[in-house]
């Protein structure tokens, strides 16, 4: 079976990972960093905003079940793609809304989806999502992997991540994988 990979960032990678992990067709997802100028950045370094890396997720998915275009369409509904360098209380370039295509085909698809979403006026403001070429994806430290599932009672998880997961389940029920535990959010 052939798999495709996408690298996207929409604020805190814990949030994006938690929602997209529930998406039918996703085989694996890894939080990490990309788009900056420092090799092998750490979470602490990225949080300073000086590395210019974004918190991103690397999503490996089955294109026979989930197309890259549909993944991007869903991605643009699970975070606020209209506010530059911010998601809620999380502020800084590391929280920018970004699509990092790995090929010309992905870049063209990303441009098409952004134009489609703008034209549909789904959001009240213009999109601030950028398209940046994927140079290197740096996996995040192990403590960031599947953070929401491992810390569901943490204050940030309850206040920020759980509502996003519940909203995704409600508004995109036809895209939620069948074997997700209802206790996850």
UniProtKB/Swiss-Prot annotation:
GO annotations under biological process?
protein modification process
Claim: Repressor is one of the keywords in the record: no
Active-site positions on this chain = 12
Domain of life where this protein originates: Bacteria
Tell me the InterPro entries matching this sequence: Met_Sox_Rdtase_MsrA_dom (IPR002569), Met_Sox_Rdtase_MsrA_sf (IPR036509)
Pfam families in the cross-refs:
PMSR
Write out the entry's keywords from A to Z.
Answer: Oxidoreductase
- Recorded catalytic activity of this chain's protein: L-methionyl-[protein] + [thioredoxin]-disulfide + H2O = L-methionyl-(S)-S-oxide-[protein] + [thioredoxin]-dithiol; [thioredoxin]-disulfide + L-methionine + H2O = L-methionine (S)-S-oxide + [thioredoxin]-dithiol
Please list the GO terms describing molecular function.
L-methionine:thioredoxin-disulfide S-oxidoreductase activity; peptide-methionine (S)-S-oxide reductase activity
What EC number(s) does the entry state?
A: 1.8.4.11
The protein's matches in NCBIfam families, at most eight in alphabetical order, are given as:
msrA (TIGR00401)
Q: Hey, which family's this protein in?
A: Belongs to the MsrA Met sulfoxide reductase family.
This chain's function reads: Has an important function as a repair enzyme for proteins that have been inactivated by oxidation. Catalyzes the reversible oxidation-reduction of methionine sulfoxide in proteins to methionine.
Q: What is this protein called?
A: Peptide methionine sulfoxide reductase MsrA
What is the source species?
Granulibacter bethesdensis (strain ATCC BAA-1260 / CGDNIH1)
The gene from which this protein is expressed is msrA
